């Protein structure tokens, strides 16, 4: 796992799995974890990385409902999960799919997780829309294409766009 500061309020974290990433975003005393790394050791290290950088994670955001974007629950189990309307609908309409696909990945790569993945209580967010963080707000924009339920997050004060799977140095077959 690699972490890079993009701005004093933004840290990009890249997983060993497919070079996927997550982004920690802070405003004042609050921070969100957007997306997630994949492997258990990366998820276990994420809270310490956030704390060391002064990011108190109070919420999680999922850019879409693919299993590898929902794993921040392992790192921040007490932080509620927010997702765009279409992502929340996909989680409701495809119950257990994310967990099943995660188990298939784990079986193939001999990954052991500390507990089952829980996605209950997902907060549905309007897209396009805003979500408050500290004294500021993040902009949520529709980003269908890779999936029908994609959401991109714009961090206006840092001028950072979090695009989920749309930008990657790795081509996944």
Question: Model regions: which residues?
Answer:
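Active-site HxH/HxHxD metal-binding segment of metal-dependent hydrolases
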Residues: 43-44, 48-126, 130
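Catalytic core of the metallo-beta-lactamase
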Residues: 1-53, 57, 116-173
């Amino acid at each position: 796992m690699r972490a890079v500061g993009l701005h004093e309020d933004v840290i990009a974290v890249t997983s060993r799995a497919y070079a996927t990433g997550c982004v920690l975003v802070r405003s004042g005393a609050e921070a969100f974890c957007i997306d997630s790394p994949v492997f258990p050791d990366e998820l276990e290290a994420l809270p310490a990385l956030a704390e060391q950088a002064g990011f108190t994670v109070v919420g999680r955001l999922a850019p879409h409902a693919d299993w590898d974007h929902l794993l921040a629950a392992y790192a921040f189990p007490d932080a509620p999960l927010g997702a765009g309307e279409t992502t929340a609908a996909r989680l409701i309409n495809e119950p257990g799919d994310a967990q099943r696909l995660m188990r298939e990945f784990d079986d193939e790569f001999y990954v052991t997780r500390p507990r089952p993945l829980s996605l209950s209580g997902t907060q549905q967010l309007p897209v396009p829309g805003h979500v408050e963080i500290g004294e500021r707000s993040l902009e949520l924009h529709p980003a269908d294409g890779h999936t029908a339920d994609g959401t991109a997050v714009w961090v206006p004060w840092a001028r950072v766009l979090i695009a989920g799977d749309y930008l990657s140095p790795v081509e996944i077959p």
